[in-house]
Amino acid sequence: IKDMKNNKFGVMDILNVFPDLSNDIATTSLDTVMDYIRERIEIPNVKTDIMILAGGGHEFFARESGIRYKKNTLFDDPNENIMVHIKTRIEDTRKYYTQISLDEIRKRVDEPAWWNATRAMCAFVLVVAEKIGAKYIIPTDISMIYGII
């Protein structure tokens, strides 16, 4: 670990300020939410091309949400088998806020309430990716119980 920051700030804090993010279609803009996060989060001052998401069902989210992804061609790992280019993730997150129906997703999944915080999570992902200069995001379903190397 080159640098680490612990934040006592998360998706539920975002939902308390912007409760519409859990509605079918959000009325608060992605830019507004990202600005709010930028003002409050501490992010390590490191740069990396690849950001791996773990500990929150990120691969499940990518596969069910309409976020476009492709096979991970950067490295071979069965637990990290899909990837998203940052430009695609930004475009698709904007659509996720303004065009993709959470109600439609909730109808087809086993845990509909889990989706309430996903727009807030997406904004966090983009703020961190922006700060570290990530070009690719690798969404995984790896549990944090395994630890981070």
What do the predicted segments below correspond to?
Residues 2-149:
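Helical "lid/coupling" subdomains associated with nucleotide-phosphate turnover
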